[in-house]
Amino acid sequence: MELSEGELSHTSSSSSFVPVDQRQLQDAIQIIDENKHFNTGILDYINKTSPADVGNNYHIISVFGSQSTGKSTLLNRLFNTNFDVMDESNRQQTTKGIWLAYSPVVSTTLGHTTSKSNILVMDVEGTDGRERGEDQDFERKAALFALSTSEVLIINIWETQVGLYQGANMGLLKTVFEVNLSLFGKSKLETHNDHKVLLLIVIRDHVGVTPVESLAKTFTSDLQNMWSSLAKPAELEHLQFADFFDVTFHALNHKVLQPKEFGEGINRLDDRLVVSNELFKPEYHHDVPIDGWTMYAERCWEQIETNKDLDLPTQQILVAQFKCDEIVESVFQEFLAKYQHHFKEVDAAPDFEELGALFADLRQDAFEDYDASASRYNKAVYEQKRKKLRWLINDKLKEVFDVHAKNLCNTLLEKFEKDLVALKGKDFAVNVKTLSTKLVEDVNFQVSLMSLQGDLSLDEIILALTKDIDAIVAKQQVIELNSIVNKSVKKLSASLSKSIQFELGDPNEETWDNVLQQFKGVYEKFGGDFGLGTSSTQNQQAIEKFKFKSWCQFYDVTHKLISREKLLALLQDRFDDKFRYDENGLPKLYLNEQDLEKTFAVAKQHALQVLPILTFAKLADGSEIVPDYDIFDSKLREQFLGGYDDSDDEEDHCFAEIITEQEKSEVLAKFKKEVDAKYIETKRSIVQHITQIPYYIYLIILVLGWNEFMAIIRNPLFFSLSIVLGATVYVLYYLGLLRPALVVAQRTMDEVIVMAKTKLREVLIDDHEVTGRQLNKMAGSKENIELDDM
């Protein structure tokens, strides 16, 4: 019998246990009774229970689930409604048909909160009730109606039902989704609307052992698989589950055993609904005023009630689907047992042909077992589930397939990498193409032997292999390119070093012109594509890197070859060339101070004239050498050298400045000190030579020693020695070595005299200090000996 307009239920709210003011509660209205009659008085009820101007400011929420699972209680606790709930002492159907109620307030973590939007809640008769038995017609139509008219469909399910087929109402949901797709899928295509329904999966009696995320993953996977198995019209085949539905989850503790945690879970869910407003999205709304929605709901029920297609699929097909799923699961478990036996350990070097044959045998055995048990059921279902079994087996075999394919690729890639290194850059691009082509062909041939005639795709393997090859080649290209750059820089450095060393032999105004010309002769020849198959960008970067490093080498080599110590030594050598040797390269012997002072001034000037040349790299035209790159820039050093010293940022650098002014002053001071010492030493020898023995003394000696002189001449031995001595003096004079010989003889005699005086002092004088020092030395030696013995 159709309900009269505005007729309300007169149920008690005492069983709902809703902690709100009873005056705020509104009785629910039955919009569809158990006889499938639609109540046309919905709009009057809504106008009576809700604010005057509802308009589009409303949300429709419905609940779906098995009978006696606490759906009505859940709605009452969430939305403070007054739906009838089950008497726990007598488990029987409470909700009959579909009921609608207005939510006055919701219970959030902040307390009772009035929603900014009007919330209307539908309580749908539970499924799988004994009152209806096998008559599932109303269950399907009621579920389809709730799905078609609601923004949020709460699927009430116990934790223990997750993963089940019948327990989780998957069969009914599949039927509802299929019919919903056929009824409303064309509308989505024609209007291109983005309307969706949110499936809010509330997991009841969650004990916390299995994480909510894991349960959600299982349930979502079941929904996706179920959608994939729907019998879709051809024009709707491309539509996905996500085109029609969004899914979210919320877990609640046991209502009786954990009442406090249950209440807190209810409050958190209400927070999601009305506080954060995360569950109400514009695309869920039907985008019609409330009076339009009531008309829409009535016409939806009319279409659902009169459409004969809702009687499909038949129970036979449902049974076939269920049984074939059971057979698939059983056969697949048997396959897994064989799989574990054969592939418990991974063979490091398998025979791919034998492995492919084993794959085929295992799969064929599973197909034969499935065919023997499932072929008697509906042919379409049987073939569909056989495809599912094929997919499951292939997916499992793909694991072993991928492992062996990866091992093969890794082994061949290692050899490929060694072959690339062995090339040492010779014909690199050509050889890389040859080696990489051979590698891909080898992998393709070997892996195809176990691919089950292409059922196990090689595309991912070959794609990954190609990427690995490209990565290895790119890495080796960089190594070879860097090697070319470094070798070229080293060659340039050697050439530059030779050029600078040559110029240091006789620096002049064109010294740095010659060095720069030699540098640029090598510097400007570097370039080309290098024969590595690298891109033009990489080649250009290599050229820039070479040029930057070349200028760095120019700076480093010049500072290495022209340091303070080496510059001082060079100045001293140039001074000695003029001061100690004559133009023929023979040692000079100074006989007077005038000659000494003149030569000293010339030698000093000769040495110092190269000081400004070697301390600052300046060309003949007066301009300083400026590099093409600022080699002191930290960013450039980071880019081309891979790092830089932070302390260098605090110093001001000038590329052309080899020796700073301070260092130059230090070198000049040391040089003057050294040459002045040489001047004084040479001058002292002249004075000693002049003041040693007057010439007239030799005349007196000759007169007074005439008799002795004659005795020497008459003695053959003495005469022979005189002849030898005279000849020696003549030869030295003839060769121009007499003066140096006299200097050497004089210095030798001085040393002999000094040593003789020292020995004579030791013998004749009782020097206590000397004796003490000797005793100390002896004592020290003894201690050292004792320490060595220890």
Swiss-Prot record:
Residues 714-716 are lumenal. The chain crosses the membrane at residues 693-713, 717-737. Residues 1-692, 738-790 are cytoplasmic. It is a multi-pass membrane protein. Its EC number is 3.6.5.-. The keyword Hydrolase applies. Residues 55-284 form the GB1/RHD3-type G domain. GO terms for cellular component: cortical endoplasmic reticulum; endoplasmic reticulum; endoplasmic reticulum membrane. SUPFAM superfamilies: P-loop containing nucleoside triphosphate hydrolases (SSF52540). Keywords: Endoplasmic reticulum, GTP-binding, Hydrolase, Membrane, Nucleotide-binding, Transmembrane, Transmembrane helix. It is found in: Endoplasmic reticulum membrane. It comes from the Eukaryota. One of its GO terms (biological process) is hexose transmembrane transport. One of its GO terms (molecular function) is GTPase activity. InterPro entries: G_GB1_RHD3_dom (IPR030386), P-loop_NTPase (IPR027417), RHD3/Sey1 (IPR008803), Sey1/RHD3-like_3HB (IPR046758). Gene3D superfamilies: P-loop containing nucleotide triphosphate hydrolases (3.40.50.300). The keyword Nucleus does not apply. GTP binds at G65, S66, Q67, S68, T69, G70, K71, S72. Belongs to the TRAFAC class dynamin-like GTPase superfamily. GB1/RHD3 GTPase family. RHD3 subfamily. Cooperates with the reticulon proteins and tubule-shaping DP1 family proteins to generate and maintain the structure of the tubular endoplasmic reticulum network. Has GTPase activity, which is required for its function in ER organization. Required for virulence and resistance to cycloheximide. This is Protein SEY1. It comes from Candida albicans (strain SC5314 / ATCC MYA-2876) (Yeast). The lineage of its organism: Eukaryota, Fungi, Dikarya, Ascomycota, Saccharomycotina.
